[in-house]
Protein backbone atom coordinates (compact mmCIF):
# COMPACT_ATOMS: atom_id res chain seq x y z
CA UNK A 1 0.00 0.00 0.00
CA UNK A 2 1.26 3.41 -0.92
CA UNK A 3 1.84 5.64 2.07
CA UNK A 4 2.14 9.40 1.83
CA UNK A 5 4.98 10.52 4.12
CA UNK A 6 5.07 14.21 3.45
CA UNK A 7 3.06 16.84 1.60
CA UNK A 8 4.40 20.34 1.70
CA UNK A 9 2.48 23.01 -0.10
CA UNK A 10 3.32 26.66 -0.06
CA UNK A 11 0.86 28.83 -1.92
CA UNK A 12 1.50 32.44 -2.60
CA UNK A 13 -1.53 33.84 -4.39
CA UNK A 14 -3.32 37.16 -4.44
CA UNK A 15 -5.50 38.39 -1.62
CA UNK A 16 -8.87 36.70 -2.05
CA UNK A 17 -10.93 39.84 -1.35
CA UNK A 18 -9.03 41.87 -3.94
CA UNK A 19 -9.73 45.31 -5.37
CA UNK A 20 -10.69 45.94 -9.00
CA UNK A 21 -7.77 47.08 -11.15
CA UNK A 22 -5.00 45.39 -9.14
CA UNK A 23 -2.46 42.79 -10.23
CA UNK A 24 -2.32 39.28 -8.79
CA UNK A 25 1.15 37.71 -8.56
CA UNK A 26 1.72 34.41 -6.84
CA UNK A 27 2.11 30.69 -7.12
CA UNK A 28 2.49 27.33 -5.41
CA UNK A 29 5.44 25.21 -4.37
CA UNK A 30 4.60 21.56 -3.70
CA UNK A 31 6.81 18.68 -2.57
CA UNK A 32 5.65 15.09 -2.13
CA UNK A 33 7.52 11.97 -1.08
CA UNK A 34 6.21 8.39 -0.89
CA UNK A 35 7.68 5.02 0.01
CA UNK A 36 6.10 1.75 -1.12
CA UNK A 37 7.09 -1.60 0.38
CA UNK A 38 6.70 -4.07 -2.49
CA UNK A 39 7.66 -7.72 -2.87
CA UNK A 40 10.58 -6.66 -5.06
CA UNK A 41 11.84 -4.13 -2.48
CA UNK A 42 11.23 -0.53 -1.50
CA UNK A 43 10.17 2.03 -4.08
CA UNK A 44 10.70 5.70 -3.23
CA UNK A 45 9.02 8.52 -5.16
CA UNK A 46 9.77 12.24 -4.86
CA UNK A 47 8.00 14.99 -6.77
CA UNK A 48 8.37 18.77 -6.89
CA UNK A 49 6.09 21.36 -8.54
CA UNK A 50 6.47 25.11 -8.94
CA UNK A 51 3.41 27.00 -10.25
CA UNK A 52 3.56 30.81 -10.59
CA UNK A 53 0.53 32.91 -11.64
CA UNK A 54 0.00 36.48 -12.84
CA UNK A 55 -3.47 37.95 -13.23
CA UNK A 56 -5.48 41.13 -13.54
CA UNK A 57 -8.38 41.72 -11.14
CA UNK A 58 -10.95 43.21 -13.53
CA UNK A 59 -13.80 43.13 -10.97
CA UNK A 60 -13.95 43.00 -7.17
CA UNK A 61 -14.80 39.27 -7.43
CA UNK A 62 -13.11 38.24 -10.71
CA UNK A 63 -9.47 37.76 -11.74
CA UNK A 64 -8.09 36.44 -15.05
CA UNK A 65 -4.50 35.68 -15.94
CA UNK A 66 -1.75 33.30 -16.99
CA UNK A 67 -0.37 30.30 -15.11
CA UNK A 68 2.70 28.11 -15.55
CA UNK A 69 3.80 24.89 -13.84
CA UNK A 70 7.10 23.04 -13.94
CA UNK A 71 7.21 19.55 -12.40
CA UNK A 72 9.86 16.95 -11.67
CA UNK A 73 9.31 13.35 -10.54
CA UNK A 74 11.88 10.72 -9.58
CA UNK A 75 11.05 7.15 -8.61
CA UNK A 76 13.75 4.78 -7.33
CA UNK A 77 13.33 1.04 -6.96
CA UNK A 78 15.81 -1.65 -6.01
CA UNK A 79 17.19 -1.92 -9.56
CA UNK A 80 15.07 0.58 -11.48
CA UNK A 81 14.67 4.33 -11.73
CA UNK A 82 12.11 6.56 -13.47
CA UNK A 83 12.56 10.29 -14.11
CA UNK A 84 9.86 12.57 -15.51
CA UNK A 85 9.80 16.31 -16.18
CA UNK A 86 6.67 18.18 -17.22
CA UNK A 87 5.31 21.66 -17.67
CA UNK A 88 1.96 23.40 -18.13
CA UNK A 89 1.22 26.78 -19.71
CA UNK A 90 -2.29 28.15 -19.57
CA UNK A 91 -4.84 30.67 -18.41
CA UNK A 92 -6.97 30.85 -15.28
CA UNK A 93 -10.01 32.67 -14.00
CA UNK A 94 -10.77 33.12 -10.29
CA UNK A 95 -14.06 33.95 -8.61
CA UNK A 96 -13.91 35.20 -5.01
CA UNK A 97 -16.79 35.44 -2.55
CA UNK A 98 -16.12 37.37 0.69
CA UNK A 99 -17.82 35.85 3.73
CA UNK A 100 -16.69 38.50 6.24
CA UNK A 101 -13.75 40.88 6.85
CA UNK A 102 -11.69 37.84 7.86
CA UNK A 103 -12.90 34.99 5.61
CA UNK A 104 -13.34 34.56 1.85
CA UNK A 105 -13.72 31.56 -0.42
CA UNK A 106 -12.45 31.41 -3.98
CA UNK A 107 -12.22 28.97 -6.86
CA UNK A 108 -9.60 28.87 -9.62
CA UNK A 109 -10.49 27.38 -13.01
CA UNK A 110 -7.44 26.80 -15.20
CA UNK A 111 -6.87 25.35 -18.67
CA UNK A 112 -3.98 25.11 -21.12
CA UNK A 113 -1.22 23.09 -22.78
CA UNK A 114 0.90 20.45 -21.02
CA UNK A 115 3.99 18.49 -22.05
CA UNK A 116 5.98 15.68 -20.43
CA UNK A 117 9.31 13.91 -21.00
CA UNK A 118 10.29 10.74 -19.17
CA UNK A 119 13.07 8.16 -18.97
CA UNK A 120 13.16 4.72 -17.33
CA UNK A 121 16.34 2.93 -16.27
CA UNK A 122 17.07 -0.63 -15.17
CA UNK A 123 20.48 -1.21 -13.55
CA UNK A 124 21.54 2.24 -14.86
CA UNK A 125 20.72 1.25 -18.47
CA UNK A 126 18.16 3.38 -20.33
CA UNK A 127 15.26 1.04 -21.19
CA UNK A 128 12.59 3.50 -22.37
CA UNK A 129 12.06 7.14 -23.20
CA UNK A 130 8.78 8.98 -23.69
CA UNK A 131 7.58 12.40 -24.84
CA UNK A 132 3.99 13.55 -24.66
CA UNK A 133 1.89 16.67 -25.00
CA UNK A 134 -1.73 17.49 -24.41
CA UNK A 135 -4.20 19.71 -22.62
CA UNK A 136 -5.40 20.16 -19.05
CA UNK A 137 -8.20 21.77 -17.10
CA UNK A 138 -8.65 21.94 -13.34
CA UNK A 139 -10.86 23.50 -10.68
CA UNK A 140 -9.50 24.25 -7.20
CA UNK A 141 -11.65 25.77 -4.42
CA UNK A 142 -9.97 27.36 -1.39
CA UNK A 143 -10.60 29.26 1.85
CA UNK A 144 -8.77 32.53 2.58
CA UNK A 145 -8.19 33.85 6.13
CA UNK A 146 -7.15 37.51 6.32
CA UNK A 147 -4.48 37.82 9.03
CA UNK A 148 -3.35 41.47 8.74
CA UNK A 149 -3.12 44.17 6.04
CA UNK A 150 -3.88 41.83 3.15
CA UNK A 151 -1.58 39.07 4.35
CA UNK A 152 -3.38 35.82 4.95
CA UNK A 153 -3.54 32.06 4.79
CA UNK A 154 -5.07 29.94 2.02
CA UNK A 155 -6.44 26.47 2.67
CA UNK A 156 -7.36 23.98 -0.04
CA UNK A 157 -8.31 20.32 0.38
CA UNK A 158 -8.07 19.20 -3.23
CA UNK A 159 -9.90 19.78 -6.46
CA UNK A 160 -10.83 18.15 -9.72
CA UNK A 161 -9.26 18.08 -13.14
CA UNK A 162 -8.87 16.43 -16.52
CA UNK A 163 -5.68 15.91 -18.56
CA UNK A 164 -5.00 14.41 -21.98
CA UNK A 165 -1.63 13.26 -23.34
CA UNK A 166 -0.61 12.01 -26.81
CA UNK A 167 2.76 10.23 -26.82
CA UNK A 168 5.23 10.87 -29.65
CA UNK A 169 7.08 7.56 -29.92
CA UNK A 170 4.29 5.10 -29.05
CA UNK A 171 0.68 4.77 -30.13
CA UNK A 172 -0.80 5.71 -26.75
CA UNK A 173 -3.34 8.39 -25.92
CA UNK A 174 -3.85 8.97 -22.20
CA UNK A 175 -6.83 10.65 -20.57
CA UNK A 176 -7.02 11.11 -16.82
CA UNK A 177 -9.62 12.56 -14.49
CA UNK A 178 -8.94 13.27 -10.84
CA UNK A 179 -11.21 14.14 -7.96
CA UNK A 180 -9.13 14.44 -4.81
CA UNK A 181 -11.22 16.37 -2.29
CA UNK A 182 -10.07 15.42 1.20
CA UNK A 183 -7.01 13.52 -0.09
CA UNK A 184 -4.63 16.47 -0.26
CA UNK A 185 -4.16 19.62 1.75
CA UNK A 186 -2.50 22.83 0.74
CA UNK A 187 -1.73 25.61 3.21
CA UNK A 188 -0.17 28.80 2.00
CA UNK A 189 0.32 32.51 2.50
CA UNK A 190 -1.00 35.28 0.29
CA UNK A 191 -0.77 39.02 -0.26
CA UNK A 192 -2.63 41.46 -2.49
CA UNK A 193 -0.42 43.91 -4.41
For the regions a protein language model found, what residue spans apply to each?
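Internal, hydrophobic beta-strand segments that form the core of beta-sheet-rich folds
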Residues: 156-158
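Flexible loop residues that form catalytic
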Residues: 9, 67, 160
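Individual transmembrane alpha-helices with interfacial aromatic-anchor signatures
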Residues: 174-182
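Outer-membrane beta-barrel porins/channels
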Residues: 39, 125-128, 140, 165, ...
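Sec-dependent signal peptide cleavage junction
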Residues: 16-43
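Cleavable N-terminal export/targeting peptides
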Residues: 1-22, 193
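Short Gly/Pro-enriched loop/turn and capping motifs at secondary-structure junctions
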Residues: 148, 160-164
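Gram-negative (and chloroplast) outer-membrane scaffold detector with strong preference
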Residues: 22-23, 29, 33, 48, ...
Amino acid sequence: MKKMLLILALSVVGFANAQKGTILVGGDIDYTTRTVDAETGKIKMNSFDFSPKVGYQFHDNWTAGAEFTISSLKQDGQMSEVKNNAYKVGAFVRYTMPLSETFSVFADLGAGFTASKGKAYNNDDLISESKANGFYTDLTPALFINMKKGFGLNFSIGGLGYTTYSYDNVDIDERSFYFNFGKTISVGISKNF
